[in-house]
């Protein structure tokens, strides 16, 4: 995040930063303005504006469309209970972080359990956080204390190398010290349901997060069903799982994934478009897709639409496809993994 002329804080294309920092800024004693790139200015911020206003915050979309740019006037906040209509760790974390500046306990209940990194982190640094079922609560007291934290490897970034190992014959890949938080390990469960060989070795706790080495080997895959409460645990990994499904035998159904339409791009539409361009048999649905796998895929020109997860997913697809694949705007991977292509090339040596 950086400052740009006109007193705006600029969050690039980072929806997590935009939503979480809004919760913190809402309880301060000063005013703030937030904006981001074209993708951020299309993503729905009404989902955080509503609960923050319920806490007494002054926050508005400057264009009146529920998206950034946002103006936030810091105010004293009230503790609330919020029933979130979406299972979103970004929404939950925004409200809980605002709750640190409220006058009473703040709690959030979700329709399905989303990733819980914020709750673990706050507790690790001395926060009074409770979690029961699909509800998380935070108290404004005691105040957080500083300390040393350790963060394991990101399973969302590891996912592309897990997939590459499954698709390239003869592969065996060991990824060390990867976070395996059970609210984030949906991709491992899906790979196993597809008969993929993935093993957890040297399990440990890194700071406040469970971690392990991941050993993955090439093997034949079959179709599976991905939906329900599993979706929040792998929402960012669905693009690479769709790629795996296209190479697997049988049919894979992805459902309950409408949230992909409001990410950096409409990922559902782009996945259907791109997989079809490579020769896959894919039918889009309102909240997912049906992938009839087992076809040989071929290279194609893939428009990433400036979406880092689309670019990385189809770089992996290209490894197992016949012919050459060109990815437009391939450098968009820098938003989350600047060294992705270097690391992928090293893996192939």
Give the role of each language-model region.
Residues 1-349:
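Structural preference for solvent-exposed beta-strand-turn elements
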């Amino acid at each position: 995040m950086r400052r740009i002329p006109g007193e705006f804080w600029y969050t690039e294309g980072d929806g997590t930063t935009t939503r979480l920092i809004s919760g913190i800024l809402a309880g301060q004693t000063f005013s703030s303005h937030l904006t981001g790139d074209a993708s951020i200015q299309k993503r729905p911020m009404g989902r955080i504006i509503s609960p923050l206003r319920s806490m007494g915050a002054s926050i508005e979309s400057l264009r009146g469309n529920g998206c950034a740019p946002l103006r936030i006037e810091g105010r004293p906040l009230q503790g609330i209970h919020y029933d979130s209509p979406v299972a979103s760790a970004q929404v939950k974390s925004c409200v809980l972080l605002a709750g640190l500046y409220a006058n009473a306990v703040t709690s959030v209940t979700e329709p399905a359990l989303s990733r819980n990194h914020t709750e673990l982190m706050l507790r690790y640094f001395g926060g009074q956080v409770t979690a029961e079922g699909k509800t998380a609560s935070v108290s404004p007291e005691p105040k957080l204390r500083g300390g040393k934290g350790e963060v394991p490897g990101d399973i969302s970034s590891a996912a592309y190398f897990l997939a590459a190992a499954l698709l390239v014959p003869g592969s065996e890949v060991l990824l060390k010290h990867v976070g395996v938080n059970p609210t984030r390990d949906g991709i491992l469960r899906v790979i196993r349901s597809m008969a993929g060989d993935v093993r957890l070795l040297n399990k440990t706790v890194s700071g406040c997060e469970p971690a392990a080495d991941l050993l993955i080997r090439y093997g034949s895959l079959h179709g599976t069903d991905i939906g329900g409460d599993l979706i929040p645990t792998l929402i960012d990994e669905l693009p690479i799982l769709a790629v795996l499904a296209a190479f697997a035998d049988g049919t894979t159904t992805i459902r309950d994934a409408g949230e992909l339409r409001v990410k950096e791009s409409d990922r559902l539409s782009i996945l259907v478009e791109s997989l079809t361009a490579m020769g896959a048999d894919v039918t889009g649905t309102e909240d997912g897709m049906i992938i009839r796998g087992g076809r040989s895929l071929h290279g194609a020109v893939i428009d990433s639409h400036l979406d880092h997860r689309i670019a990385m997913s189809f770089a992996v697809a290209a490894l197992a496809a016949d012919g050459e694949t060109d990815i437009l705007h391939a450098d968009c991977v820098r938003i989350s993994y600047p060294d992705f292509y270097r690391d992928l090339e090293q893996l192939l040596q």
